[in-house]
A protein has these predicted regions:
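Hydrophobic transmembrane alpha-helices of multi-pass small-molecule transport proteins
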Residues: 55, 145, 154-176, 230, ...
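Specific alpha-helical transmembrane segments that line the substrate/conduction pathway
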Residues: 42-53, 111, 116-153, 158, ...
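Glycine-/small-residue-enriched transmembrane alpha-helix faces in small-molecule transporters
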Residues: 1-46, 51, 109, 121, ...
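Specific transmembrane alpha-helical segments of multi-pass solute transporters/efflux pumps
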Residues: 22, 27, 62-68, 73-135, ...
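Transmembrane alpha-helical segments that form core, pore/gating elements
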Residues: 19, 31, 55, 142-144, ...
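Cytoplasmic-side transmembrane-helix entry/capping segments in multi-pass membrane proteins
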Residues: 16, 100-104, 154-166, 213-222, ...
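Juxtamembrane helix-entry segments on the extracytoplasmic side of multipass membrane proteins
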Residues: 7-13, 37-41, 45, 96-100, ...
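Helix-helix packing/entry segments at the starts of transmembrane helices
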Residues: 20, 45-46, 130-137, 203-228, ...
Length: 328
């Protein structure tokens, strides 16, 4: 019986599409949870509480063996030698350097705690479709940070892509400004854009550490930092309320943690390994379209010509930007 073997490119395409579509469901599930009256802090704490064991497993897979070697060495080393840092110590072959713990903590705060918190807050005021389109501006924020912070040159094509992307966002924004659709579109948009900016700082600041630690190790440890912050915040704000939520809210939080947080991480990483970062990013362009479709079907969010055209324009702008970055 013949065995069907997928080519690496086809596997990468499948992983990328599935990961993008799962991640695009996040806003839909959060909106469903809000219908049960749960607070932002409580639901975010629940999501990260359920996700923490998976990130801890990845972190242990990455560094568990090295930690065990170091612990055994400390037990067996002569008195007064445990602080010595010559080539005989387990630290000598470690990818971690002095100060990395604080760098990872800062990246976890910016990229996974603050970005998530602002995003969850923003979804109280804007549609899931607008939220996804605004988050899709991430590459343009990274470009602007590279210009004004890192002083890197930008080509005319990149500036064109920037203008096209923001034109599309304006169109989608105008669609959501209909008073019958949302509560406070300007506030919600500002919060989601703040989330996007916070995550862009993470992307710009994580470059050297990603190359040295690897994407999975860095993501796991930074996410664990965010898990601690989110759960602590939920307990400080609501006490034990996060443990007294109805089954529906607990189930939605678990689904958000597994299917919209953990799985997309592994699938996107696998897609990048098979396709490369440029092509994987282009595959991810299905995200905003899928969110708008689910918003209409699951949440009953109205769609319109401005939203559809604006989303297409944003995708075009990001596509131009990603291709320009690939050629650079």
């Amino acid at each position: 019986m013949p065995v069907c073997r997928w080519k690496p490119e086809h596997l990468g395409l499948f992983y990328g599409l599935l990961g993008s579509m799962l991640f695009a469901c996040k806003g839909i599930l959060i909106k469903l949870a809000y219908r049960h009256g749960v607070s932002t802090e409580t639901f975010l704490g629940l999501r990260m509480m359920w996700a923490a064991p998976f990130f801890a497993w990845v972190a242990w897979r990455s560094d568990g063996a090295a930690l065990r070697r170091r612990w055994r060495w400390r037990r067996q080393a002569p008195a007064g030698m445990t602080g010595h840092s010559d080539d005989a110590t387990p630290r000598a072959d470690s990818v971690w350097r002095s100060g990395d713990v604080w760098r990872v903590a800062g990246l976890g705060f910016s990229g996974y705690y603050l970005a998530s918190y602002l995003d969850f807050l923003g979804l109280q005021y804007v549609s899931a479709g607008l939220e996804r389109v605004l988050l899709y501006l991430g590459p343009t924020f990274v470009l602007l940070l590279s210009v004004f912070w890192l002083k890197r040159p930008v080509s005319r094509t990149q500036w064109t892509a920037l203008g096209v992307s923001y034109l599309g966002v304006i169109l989608v924004y105008l669609h959501d400004l209909d008073g019958s659709l949302q509560v406070n579109v300007p506030l919600g948009s500002a919060l989601v854009l703040g989330s996007c900016l916070s995550y862009s700082f993470y992307l710009v600041g994580a470059g050297e550490m990603v190359r040295r630690l690897g994407p999975m190790r860095l993501t796991a440890w930074a996410s664990l930092v965010a898990c601690v912050l989110c759960v602590t915040q939920a307990l400080l704000v609501g006490g034990a309320d996060m443990f007294r939520q109805p089954t529906e809210v607990q189930g939605i939080a678990l689904m958000t943690a597994i299917f919209c947080t953990v799985f997309p991480l592994f699938l996107t990483t696998a897609s990048v390994n098979h396709l490369g970062a440029g092509k994987a990013a282009q595959v991810g362009m299905i995200g905003p379209v899928w969110t708008i479709f689910l918003g209409a079907v699951v949440l009953g969010e109205p769609t319109g010509g401005l939203q559809i055209v604006g989303t297409a324009v944003v995708i075009l702008g990001v596509l131009i930007l990603s291709r320009a970055a690939t050629r650079a």
